[in-house]
Amino acid sequence: MSMSDPIGDMLTRIRNAGRAKHETCLVPGSKIKKSILDLMKEEGFIKDYESVKVNETFEDYKVFLKYDHTKRPIIRELVRVSTPGRRVYIKSAEIRPYKNNIGTLIVSTSKGIMTGKNARKLKLGGEVILKMS
């Protein structure tokens, strides 16, 4: 059976691994997931990720999760905003700081996938993929 929301599945895997206090989790690979993981690493929500070859055509990403000094996950909230059944778009003027700049919006724009902060600076709107804090 095919997966209807691969990005939502990736977020759920990361969220569940964090709650179970796992050091890593494995997510199926794609270009958009790689872009999202790059932004999560850049914003400090994950330590790192690496590509793992499944076979000649498919690859997975091994995500290294990040925890604070009390062993609580750094990612407190990881929510899919725009789903395949309900797309959510936002204009650049409507992009506001999320959770008083503690959280981050990930937006898919015409210039690629970027944080809400960068999209606002470049005056680009787009589809709100997820929000995290």
Swiss-Prot record:
Coiled-coil zones: none
GO annotation, cellular component aspect: ribonucleoprotein complex; ribosome
Pfam family for this entry, one: Ribosomal_S8
Gene Ontology BP annotations: translation
Entry-linked InterPro entries: Ribosomal_uS8 (IPR000630), Ribosomal_uS8_CS (IPR047863), Ribosomal_uS8_sf (IPR035987)
Cross-referenced PROSITE patterns: RIBOSOMAL_S8
Keywords linked to the UniProt accession: Ribonucleoprotein, Ribosomal protein, RNA-binding, rRNA-binding
Stated role: One of the primary rRNA binding proteins, it binds directly to 16S rRNA central domain where it helps coordinate assembly of the platform of the 30S subunit.
Family, similarity comment: Belongs to the universal ribosomal protein uS8 family.
Protein name as annotated: Small ribosomal subunit protein uS8
Species per Swiss-Prot/TrEMBL record: Leptospira interrogans serogroup Icterohaemorrhagiae serovar copenhageni (strain Fiocruz L1-130)
Gene giving rise to this polypeptide: rpsH
